[in-house]
Amino acid sequence: MRRLRYILQSNYVIKIITILLFVIDIIYTNYHCFKSKYDEDNTEFIGIVTNYELKEDKIVIEIKGYEKLIVNYKYNDEIFNKLSYGDKILVKGKLYVPNKNSNFNAFNYQKYLYYKKIYYIVNASSIDKIQNNKNYFYTIKNILYKKIENMKSSDYIKTLLFCDNSLSKDVKDSYRINGISHLFSVSGMHINFFISILFWYLNKITFNKRIKFIINDIFIILYLILFPSASLFRCAIMSILFSIDFIFKLKIKKIDILFLTLLFSIIINPFIIYDLGYIYSYIVTFFLILSSNKLKKMNRLSKIIYISILSFIVSIPITIYNSYEVNIISVLLNIFLVPIISIIILPLTIVTFIFPIFDNVLFLFTSLLESISLFISKIDITKIIFPKPSIIIIVIYYLVIIFSYRNRKYLLIIVFLLMGIYMYPYLNSSFKVVMFDVGEGDSYLIKYPNNKANILIDTGFNEYRMKNEIISYLKSIGIRKLDYLIITHGDEDHMGEAITLVNNFKVDKVIFNIGEYQTHEKELIEVLDKKKIKYYNNLKQLNIDKYKLYFLNTKIYDNENDNSNVIYFNYKNFKFLFMGDASVKREMDILDKYNLINIDLLKVGHHGSKTSSSKKFIDEVNPKYSLISVGKNNRYGHPNKEVLNNLEKTKIYRTDIDGSIMYKIKNNKLKIETCAP
């Protein structure tokens, strides 16, 4: 025991061991190949229901058989209403590997599930219950969920008490944008509140501190079993370690208990370090412990202000690494909301759960909170976009904060680091052309060096991809506005998400094609007029610094595809040609009017349809690389085999195979990257 006490009280041993294990864990989880116990040929799966929910028009169930599986099943009232936690079900269907991100810097669903030890998704054709729940803990969970299912405020009871974030996507997004989402997940603040109630009760019945700590740990462990979450997992391990320290009088420092918490977390679940909730919870707790001496001297209001500012500062790298923007108003919101959540909302949630008569009162408070959050989240002036920082920069950031506890002058380095990250796009001398994977549609980015100009050609017609992948990518490389949105023509697959774009991202000017405005274009123009965004059509050229973009207009056609904006430009010695949906007829007219030879990069017309890319045209322009934006297994049969034959002398990149493609030029050297799904 003495030797153990000596090791635990050492200033460095625990820290060194934990850091070494952390590094080993990163290597192990990223380079070791974890294999599924299922075979892709399996079509029947038996498992216990551990979670289930409705998502749009389908039931999504998580089951535990040989390993965890996600089951997708078309919505069925009868089946959904019969489901309960702990039920054993038989699922028939086909296994498939979860989708990887096919656009740069987008959310990787495959990796997200991999870190949860889920390797397959089942597209179910049938689901049958073969045994009702027999697990005591699941029985309690079912009773608790049944109790609140008809309450107006059930989503907040699930979120604040059951570790089940059932809030609507819009509300969750607003909380995330405003930097207050941590207030709506069961974490240290919530657990401390529950423990304070428990200790108040225990003080009435016993004076033995050891018994209090043991009962407290039992409570947290049972809570974790019922409602597992990463941040609660950290709280549970930390609480147990504090109890062991107290009972055996080991006198371990708080900071070392936190390191031991990480060590045991990694041993129990090596993938815990990739959980965003755990990362945030751990880092904030780490710096709160470092600040504990200061906090002891503060009154309640000063503590709230200090903790809110500290939490904001230490969360900045996590936020910009994952969301690419920081909302500076989040500090004020946290100062305002922490007491409201801890003094009003959380106690009222517990009271409402016990006494449903207060449901309307809780619903009133939460509805007001949602309205405020949704309103504030739409205020763009408080948001600062940062490009995605490297892991090295993040490590330096946290080391500087640690050193600043000894010397406050180090905080100036934080300011310079953030300024450096912010200014990086203006110092980046690379030129980029990016073809986004938008399925059967078009969307391309042209990014000039040092952020001199950013141009988006078309938007595709998938709202999720626009909001969560295209706009997200723009932010991730530090683009804060689009100088031009070029609409090649009025078809939905090319401009279907233009309104979504201008409503969610700053656009300076919009350029339309020649000919009459189509339905989607007219709808967009109404929005542009309201937002006072300038728009043009029938342009001949754009001047970008010392470079020019040419619109190869020939005449107005009866076919809208032939009225597409065909764009030619060069950067240094590289030539680019974007064909929109122009047909063979337009191609011939272009060849008659313009001299286009030895094109470096051709955006193939009309998704590789047989109506475009004639052999004569391809032979004339002689492209080195060809880009085809096409949906996987699309109903049109794009790209056409004859077109592919015409392009056989070029290197072809396709979004259905290669995902997003980045054509990058720096120091007159070309580099091509793909994001294969």
Task: Describe the residue ranges of each PLM region.
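Hydrophobic alpha-helical transmembrane segments in multi-pass membrane proteins
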Residues: 3-10, 16-20, 171-330, 389-428, ...
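Hydrophobic alpha-helical segments of integral membrane proteins
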Residues: 133-148, 156, 164, 171, ...
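Aromatic-rich juxtamembrane segments at the membrane interface
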Residues: 115-236, 243-244, 434, 484, ...
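Residue-level signal for inorganic ion chemistry
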Residues: 47, 137, 151, 277, ...
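Non-globular, low-confidence helical/coil segments that flank catalytic cores
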Residues: 46, 75-94, 132, 201, ...
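Hydrophobic alpha-helical segments of membrane proteins
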Residues: 156, 308-321, 343-347, 372
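Membrane-interface helix/helix-cap signal primarily in integral membrane proteins
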Residues: 3-7, 19-182, 468-475, 481, ...
